[in-house]
Amino acid sequence: MLPDVIFVGPTKCGTTWIDTYLRTREEVVLPSDCKETFFFDKAFDKGVPWYESHFRGQGGTCVEVAPSLFHKPDALANVRAVCPNARIVIMFRDPFERVVSHYFHYRKQGVAQMPVAEMATRHPDMIEASLFHKYSLMWMEAFPGQVSFVSYDLLKSDPVGFCSVICDVTGIPDTVPPADALAGRAVNAASLPRSAALAHVTRRGAELARRMGGHGLVNWLRKTGLKKLAFSGGGDVSAERDAVKHDVLGLTPQLAPDLSAFNATYGKKINGI
């Protein structure tokens, strides 16, 4: 079984929430032992049978939520080769807000506080994953007529309406979500680790386990509370967040032209605007 629908990201655009919601839907088949397989960008050498083994459901709509793929041309080529008929879903978020969230993603993993520009130099994906026009164009060209856009803002303002949009682009019945499907499904909030060293070691260990095929182990450890222990508990981030929101405006030359081009080309195609 291969995906009928792939949410290609980018990261920090509500994809964890989407994966969690879709797992409440019996008619949807997702990877059984992990959220994201990283097959198309990090594990393609393992082969298609290995990838298919993650989808163990009986029938239904097969979906992977894989936000790491959006800004990676090689991953796009791999998706095109293996799943040429898949529906591709791109999540749109204000690129400046997305960079701020991505900054705190690295802070949460134990990276030291630094200016946004320096963080972006060390981690180029902070900017690359916010270039919505550049990479949406690539996906549109590779999958003509198969790409949908969904607004992250709708998730924050109207979760039930957001679920309806997700049902539409996924091709599953749009039913009123039960209360327990939305309870506790808050959008990921920024946090800092109680120990940068512990967060760093935990992240590296998880990456190594995934490379060795230990997705199930990583998923089990998440359920034990290790993720919360390693990546949170470090105090209030509000002051740093305010500074980062101001600092990110320095990236206007890199982000604004692409945003203008995206709005002009795809703005009317976004679900939830």
Could you say what each language-model-derived stretch is?
Residues 1-273:
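Anion-recognition interface
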